[in-house]
Amino acid sequence: MLWVKVRYLDASALVKLVVDEGDHDYVRQFYHSTTNFAATSLCLAEALGAVKAKWSHGRISEEQYFAATRNLVINAWGGRIEIDDINLFTPQSLSSVESLAKRHSLDLSDSLQLATILQGKYAHLGPNSASVLVTADRKLAMAAESEGIRAWNCILSPAAAWV
């Protein structure tokens, strides 16, 4: 049986979708072969900033920079990557996000991603349809797993069937 699940892409995975790096193959193959991707608005902004840093430091050309940022924005704008996050601008949400950040020594962007998976739009889905975090960040993957979130480190191996 095939289960529907949402795959949340963190900033590191988003960057690998649009910038040629030596370890981008697994995530790109997976992205082009399946559906139901999401990211928080903050992760998308973080990814755009990371692409800018690569351009600013001469690691990619101006042409590559604009192609990468255009690709990210169009994928979000067109719905290929759904923008989904809990409202960070409420006392309860901020407290929840800060708590996750402090517990796992994460920044707000990473902890917002975890809080969104735990409390957001798709949090109610049953065990076989539970959302998955797609990341190239080992520390974030470990934090997600300790919170009961399934995580796939997209630079270590191809996607398993449960992703």
Which ranges hold each PLM region?
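Hydrophobic/aromatic ligand-binding patch that stacks against planar heteroaromatic rings
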Residues: 29, 116, 143
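Short, well-structured N-terminal submotif of metal-dependent ribonuclease cores
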Residues: 1-43, 50-68, 149, 153-163
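Short loop/helix-cap segments at secondary-structure boundaries that form the rim of catalytic
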Residues: 141-147
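Active-site neighborhoods of divalent-metal-dependent phosphate/nucleic-acid chemistry enzymes
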Residues: 79-139
